[in-house]
Amino acid sequence: MRRLFAVAVLALVLPGAADAARYAVGLAPGADRAAVAQAVEEHTGGRVAPLAPFALALDATGARGVARLPGVAYVERLGARGRALSFLPTDPMATRQWHLGAVQAFDAWLQRPTLPSMRVAVIDSGIDAGHPEFAGRIANAKSFVGGSARRDRHGHGTFIAGLIAASLNNGEGISGMAFPAQLLVAKVVRPDGVVPLEAEARAIRWAVDEGAAVINLSLGGVRDPADQSRDSFSPLEANAVEYAIRSGVIVVAAVGNGDNAPERPWRYASYPAALPHVLGVSAFSRDGAVPSFSNRDPVYNDVAAPGDELFSTLPRAITARRPLCADQGYSDCGPQEYLRPQGTSFAAAVASAGAVLVRGAWPNARREQVTALLQRTATDMTSATGCRRCADGRDAVSGWGRLNVAAAVDYPGRLAPLDRTEPNDDAGARSFRVRKPTVNRSASLDFWDDQNDVYAVRLRRGGRLVATLSRASANVSLVLWKPGTRSVNERRSLANVAAQSVNVGRVKVVRFGLQSRVRRAGIYYLQVSITEPGATAYTLRTVRR
């Protein structure tokens, strides 16, 4: 252990009396090391030696008053606290899984903890259900494209499933990161490699109804807001994802690889990662860089996870084509694309596994609180960490930064406040119905994940609505939409605007109302939007007259 080694070294360098204690004396910025050392020795009568560029080691019978000496930042007694190694998997190939250490998968625990079992849906190409790594790990499996979900001719689904839920400490092979997970396997990939949208939508619905806590979607289609002919947005897919979100399921999706986009790296996340409340995941390499294949996005790229040179399971029917290869059932014995596999698909799987561990460690947290925690505790990626294309803070390349499971598990602060109106992102059935004449409601907005909250308010003919927005810490706007509005996100809907706030800005209270009473009875939609990067809580008061 590091602590024992440090103590042994200091014992050789700094012998002291039997009743002496050892202290670390921190140096204030700009302090003269020699002057501080001399002052400490004179004050305590002890022995001082260098400990680090920012601290001294003191052997003395006491350190009272040392913290008040000029140039001293702190005094800490050593030996009272220590650190221990996190629990280490015993699987023989775990040392080859660099991603486990990169995201500090097990660093929060000294030994394998008992976390609640939860179901994770892998919506992909199926699984080699007879693989030893998945013995007792598959809760259910279903194919939505024909054939058996318990067979995988492509290998992609088995690789993803291994990263998430291969058996831990079973004495063979690799270590699945999400050790509490039970797999729900949905096969949606046809023999030609295509994923029909209908199959994906049905699979999402099935996974939710089967009790999935996390859904992994290592698939996607091109998003291009500048060219609608190329943009692959699907209302069917969006509705299926929304069903999962409303059911409290964490949905994790890959932001996509540039090989399917007009250029590389592509500047937009793929669908379904580019849907509200989905955790979009980009990839980073062993050296800390974000590869060019990983799509960028300033809004929908939430976190980065390992997505290069990963090692996982493969169907034994595929690895058997190389009978002389020793690691049958693992990617070393697979075809070329699995010998040095790279892609945001695999990064999404790592993030899904992380979501399982964090949700298990915070069993009372809701979906949006877990995803907020994963983003809030991510480690910022910059040129100092190996990512030259990354900027300080959130950026389009790595989102909030590198996934850090231990930081999320051990997070010392409060969880994000609950927004019980979510998801209420659009008009129609996606809105939150305000039923009483006067309502006060607290909610929140997030520029990157939840830009709009929409409230449905029924007004009688000749009625009037006054809305008051308070306690917002970011720029927000209010828009009232007429009955019949299908979406607040379409430009062609602008003719349906009944009223809107002007120059709201960072104010404590915003008031607006219809200057004349409405001529048409019906359900109006009140949209609250955040208009700048950031997040804010707010209080909305609506009064119908």
What are these model-derived regions, one by one?
Residues 48, 208-219, 226-227, 240, ...:
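C-terminal subdomain of the subtilisin-like protease fold in secreted/lumenal serine endopeptidases
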Residues 161-164, 184-190, 205, 213-214, ...:
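Hydrolase catalytic cores
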Residues 186-277, 287-289, 331-348, 364, ...:
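Substrate-binding/access-modulating region of protease and related hydrolase catalytic domains
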Residues 69-119, 127, 132-133, 333, ...:
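Protease zymogen maturation seam
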Residues 6-15:
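Bacterial N-terminal signal peptides
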Residues 29, 33-96:
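Autoinhibitory propeptides
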Residues 375, 398-401, 410, 439-545:
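Acidic, Ser/Thr/Pro-rich low-complexity intrinsically disordered segments
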Residues 106-140, 147-198, 210-213, 246, ...:
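Subtilisin-like serine protease catalytic core
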